[in-house]
Design a protein with these regions (language model features):
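Bacterial N-terminal signal peptides
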Residues: 5-15
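Sec/Tat signal peptide C-region and signal peptidase I cleavage site
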Residues: 16-20
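Short, structured secondary-structure elements
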Residues: 21-247
């Protein structure tokens, strides 16, 4: 049952093994701590990240934009967190709220909204190739909504990312696995399904596994695993033999 964590560790250290070699991509170099730079407009930064941004602006003889007004700020946070604009009533209430932490209250309320998981869970669902239909020319409806809802609930419940990954890769293999943990493995079942006549079922089964391997590598490592299906990867640190260890 330790295989998900062992696999992730193996790939991580394999990538780190590239450090020190000529032409190593920055993505495989461990991040280092950097002291925030000194800036001229010292009263503008509100946090260390602002100092890095301001330093670049000053080096280009540019100035920060003016602070957004309350309505613009409210619209931005609504669209960012729940994907919907505020209602006229919500705008009116926010403009009337004179508390110094009124914006923070809005952020906390939106983070607690079920819409938050729907808005941000869709990014994972897109990467996991979720769809409500099978694809191909028939594109018949499929019953996968329970996996979709699991992702939304996990996002709203702030499920730790390591557990989020483990339950999708091997939720059915966990000790005393719950129904929800088994549903999470729907991650592997998001492959397109070809129900056309004349389909070679064994070939389709193998193609489905290729799809799962490629997707798992892409969403967890940001690497194009599919290239290693036919040969050692030309750019990313993946050998063909490593690809088929996941197959």
């Amino acid at each position: 049952m330790r295989w998900p964590s062992l696999f992730l560790s193996f790939m991580f250290w394999n990538a780190l093994g590239l450090q020190g070699k000529e032409g190593v991509h920055w993505a495989f170099i461990a991040p280092q701590h950097h002291t925030p730079p000194v800036v001229k407009q010292a009263d503008w930064p509100k946090n260390p990240i602002d100092r890095f941004i301001l330093a670049e602006l000053e080096s280009a003889n540019l100035k920060p934009s003016t602070e957004a007004d309350k309505i613009t700020l409210l619209r931005r946070v609504y669209l960012d967190l729940i994907g919907l604009p505020p209602t006229p009533g919500e705008v009116k209430a926010f403009l009337a709220d004179q508390r110094p932490n009124a914006y923070e209250h809005i952020v906390e309320r939106l983070l607690a909204s079920p819409r938050y998981g729907e808005r941000w869970g869709r990014h994972w669902l897109d990467a996991a190739r979720y769809a409500d239909s099978d694809g191909y020319s028939h594109d018949a409806p499929r019953v996968m909504w329970q996996y979709r809802d699991w992702v939304i609930r996990a996002t709203n419940d702030d499920l730790p990312f390591d557990q989020f990954v483990v339950e999708q890769l091997a939720g059915d293999m966990l000790p005393n696995a719950t129904a929800a943990q088994r549903i999470a493995t729907g991650f592997h079942r998001n492959t397109q399904i070809n129900s056309e006549g004349g389909v070679d079922r064994e070939q389709f089964r193998i193609d489905s596994i290729f799809d799962r391997v490629a997707t798992t590598g892409e969403v967890l490592f940001g690497l194009t695993f599919g290239c290693a299906q036919c040969h050692d990867h030309k750019y990313d640190p993946i050998k063909q033999v490593e690809y088929y260890r996941m197959f």
